[in-house]
């Protein structure tokens, strides 16, 4: 085997190693996990809303916006529309 044969062999070994590494990672992540009793107790008796479809709305303060109205205060021209 010349230089090309060794390079091809190293490439095949590296590719197989990568495939094995990915398969081990997939199998480790798909293994069923058993929740600990502490996590179940905390979830059950936390008193919070555990609804997965609950959407919290962002609270926007009422009143003038000082960040975006900085230039309007210093200049005496009306804002462009």
UniProtKB/Swiss-Prot annotation:
Any one GO molecular-function label of the UniProt entry: receptor serine/threonine kinase binding
Keywords tagged on the record: Developmental protein, Differentiation, Glycoprotein, Hydroxylation, Secreted, Signal
Source species: Arabidopsis thaliana (Mouse-ear cress)
Annotated glycosylation sites: 64
Keyword DNA repair: no
Similarity remark: Belongs to the CLV3/ESR signal peptide family.
Annotated GO CC locations: apoplast
Signal sequence residues: 1-30
Modified residues (Hydroxyproline): 61, 64
InterPro entries linked: CLE25/26
Composition-biased stretches (Basic and acidic residues): 67-81
Protein name: CLAVATA3/ESR (CLE)-related protein 25
Recorded name of the encoding gene: CLE25
PANTHER family the UniProt entry points to: CLAVATA3/ESR (CLE)-RELATED PROTEIN 26, CLAVATA3_ESR (CLE)-RELATED PROTEIN 25
Region Disordered: start-end pairs: 57-81
GO biological process: cell-cell signaling involved in cell fate commitment; maintenance of root meristem identity; phloem development; positive regulation of abscisic acid biosynthetic process; positive regulation of response to water deprivation; regulation of cell differentiation
Keyword Hydrolase: no
Higher taxonomy: Eukaryota, Viridiplantae, Streptophyta, Embryophyta, Tracheophyta
